[in-house]
UniProtKB/Swiss-Prot annotation:
It comes from Mycobacterium ulcerans (strain Agy99). Keywords: Ribonucleoprotein, Ribosomal protein, RNA-binding, rRNA-binding. One of its GO terms (cellular component) is small ribosomal subunit. The gene is rpsE. One of its GO terms (molecular function) is structural constituent of ribosome. Residues 41-104 form the S5 DRBM domain. Belongs to the universal ribosomal protein uS5 family. GO terms for biological process: translation. InterPro entries: Ribosomal_Su5_D2-typ_SF, Ribosomal_uS5, Ribosomal_uS5_bac-type, Ribosomal_uS5_C, Ribosomal_uS5_N, Ribosomal_uS5_N_CS, Ribsml_uS5_D2-typ_fold_subgr. Residues 1-38 are annotated as: Disordered. Residues 13-38 have a biased composition (Basic and acidic residues). This is Small ribosomal subunit protein uS5. With S4 and S12 plays an important role in translational accuracy. Coiled coil: none annotated.
Length: 224
């Protein structure tokens, strides 16, 4: 009788332990889903600095991180995080960058027209380039352009070499870009008169490739 009662008490404990393990599995699965969502973005840490604050008891040290986040397909953002530890500063920078996402108009892997951006003492000049040129830019500007999905571009820093100024000047330049349709509508001209034929051809080709990729994804998803 004693063995039966002990066995009866053991069964609920086994179920509880299984339920708790299953609950942990579901929670872990949820975290995995969020991690996989974040992994779809490109992240670049441009600069990490240690700063100190003098207080009555001495000095307090903290770290700042300048982070670029983008989807590699026209979306990019810049974040600046500050914390007592480097990983926490980077995490804060990533969250701020994702909140500040903006769309960059691209045609065939390059920008739509030359543009110059300024921020504080930073000045960055961006020029479109032909396919195969690559990203010809310095480290800080390159991080922004690569995360934005730009594959061919000429970039030159005309002002301060400070990474923070260069990054913000590059972002300012990208935000000034306009699509050919916007320029044509503002001038009251057909789009062929404001955009080179090569650019329009590259846009048609990129749109055709994107449409083909969507159809292929839909076809593969419909197959059993």
């Amino acid at each position: 009788m004693a063995e039966q009662s002990a066995g009866g008490q053991g069964a609920p404990e086994g179920r509880d332990s299984r339920d708790s393990r299953e609950g942990r599995g579901r929670r872990d699965g949820g975290r995995g889903g969020r991690d996989s969502d974040k992994s779809n973005y490109l992240e670049r840490v441009v600069a990490i600095n240690r700063v100190s604050k003098v207080v009555k008891g001495g000095r307090r040290f903290s770290f700042t991180a300048l982070v670029i986040v983008g989807d590699g397909n026209g979306m990019v953002g810049v974040g600046y995080g500050k914390a007592k530890e480097v990983p926490a500063a980077i995490a804060k920078g990533v969250e701020e960058a994702r909140k500040g996402f903006f769309r960059v108009p691209l045609i065939g892997g390059t920008i739509t027209h030359p543009v110059q951006g300024e921020a504080a003492a930073g000045v960055v000049l961006l020029r479109p380039a032909s396919p195969g040129t690559g990203v010809l830019a310095g480290g800080a500007a390159r991080a922004v352009l690569e995360c934005a999905g730009v594959h061919d571009i000429l970039a030159k820093s005309l002002g301060s070499d400070n990474a923070i100024n260069v990054v913000h000047a590059t972002v300012a330049a990208l935000k000034m870009l306009q699509r050919p349709e916007e320029v044509a509508a503002r001038r009251g001209l057909p789009i062929e008169d404001v955009a080179p034929a090569g650019m329009l051809k590259a846009r048609r080709e990129s749109e055709a490739l994107a449409a083909a990729a969507v159809r292929e994804a839909q076809t593969s998803g419909a197959q059993p």
